[in-house]
Amino acid sequence: VQLSGEEKAAVLALWDKVNEEEVGGEALGRLLVVYPWTQRFFDSFGDLSNPAAVMGNPKVKAHGKKVLHSFGEGVHHLDNLKGTFAQLSELHCDKLHVDPENFRLLGNVLVVVLARHFGKDFTPELQASYQKVVAGVANALAHKYH
């Protein structure tokens, strides 16, 4: 990911304030609500029948936290995203057969959730930096598909 030193510092400073459980649960929940076809990868999660069920589902929240924790690993290793996400890329490609477009969708949903949580602190400049980061993470996760 091509970020200036200032952009990296801003991304890391915001990330240090992120509540992984809260933001992760909301981001994954929103992905499943906004793009309902993504629910097919989460058959074992129980009731995903409506937005309230999805957003209140403890398995969605728990997996969202796990996803966001992994994303945070990427934030701290921006110069080696492919290496950081190599195993997850392999898992999602070879075993789970997740459409790599879903990584881009989740990244965009995450940016929306960050904006919601951080309000005016999530400036257009910071959004631009995070868009670069989520695109880089999505590309790293899609790496094994090529």
From Swiss-Prot:
Residues 2-146 form the Globin domain. Keywords: Acetylation, Heme, Iron, Metal-binding, Oxygen transport, Phosphoprotein, S-nitrosylation, Transport. It comes from Equus hemionus kulan (Turkmenian kulan). The keyword Acetylation applies. Gene3D superfamilies: Globins. The modification Phosphoserine is found at residue 44. The gene is HBB. GO terms for cellular component: blood microparticle; haptoglobin-hemoglobin complex; hemoglobin complex. The modification N-acetylvaline is found at residue 1. The modification S-nitrosocysteine is found at residue 93. The lineage of its organism: Eukaryota, Metazoa, Chordata, Craniata, Vertebrata. This is Hemoglobin subunit beta. Heme b binds at residues 63, 92. Belongs to the globin family. Involved in oxygen transport from the lung to the various peripheral tissues.
